[in-house]
Amino acid sequence: MGIKNSIPRLDAVDKVTGAAKYTEDLIPINALVGKTLHSTIANGTVRAIDVDEAWKIPGVVDILTCFDVPDWEYATCGHPLSLDPAHTDVANKRILTKRVRYYGDEIAAVVAESDLAAQKALEAIRVEDEELPPLLTPEAAVISGIPLHEKSPDNQGGRMDFIIDESQNVRFYQGTFSMDPCIGGYVDLRGTKFHVPAQQHCHIENICCFAYMSGRKIVVVSPNQA
């Protein structure tokens, strides 16, 4: 393989003709269905969840709320775990959370015998929230004095400082930014605003996963970014 050579992708024909098997094609017919209840507020705390009516839906197998799961935290990026704290993702997310930080945060889950039963159960759940003002811009997050996460009181969960040199090349900057407009000939970008469109991988596979027991282990089958 080299420059100017056209190399066919091994799975291209199978993907465009529908012959390729995706994760959703591999789910067993008798598998239970899990669905997640998402928050309808952007910032606040879940005070109570009433699941009594949801349990009355035929086919419901189990219901879990943010009050039923451990307070274990994990990172959401899916990168390999590093034992070096400087090179690992921030673990600040619970599988179901009482502290809502964005519209759509996961607060409860339903397991049922069918997709329809799971959806009806979600619609029957009643949630009592204590809503807080949403912080919708970086400026609001910085000056509000309201921490979005207890581990990041300044609302900076992560930070990458970079500069643009005289040749318009972007470089990461490891030092401390000063109030001067330039640092050694580099432009200080703190006062500059950038607007970018929404990003999407444009994958052709639905977002889903399934799991099954193998002895005492749980095997999870999920898509990746390949």
Model region roles, listed by residue range:
Residues M1-F162:
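Flexible, low-hydrophobicity surface segments
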Residues R9, R47, K93, V111, ...:
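Generic structural signal for well-ordered, non-membrane alpha-helical segments
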Residues V16, Y173-G175:
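Short, low-to-moderate order helix/coil transition modules at the start of elongated helical scaffolds
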Residues S39-I41, E166, V196, G215:
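Non-catalytic surface loops within mature trypsin-like serine protease
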Residues D161-S167, T176-F177:
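Basic- and hydrophobic-enriched, low-structure N-terminal and domain-boundary segments
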Residues V170:
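Conserved NAD(P)+-binding/catalytic subdomain of aldehyde/semialdehyde dehydrogenases
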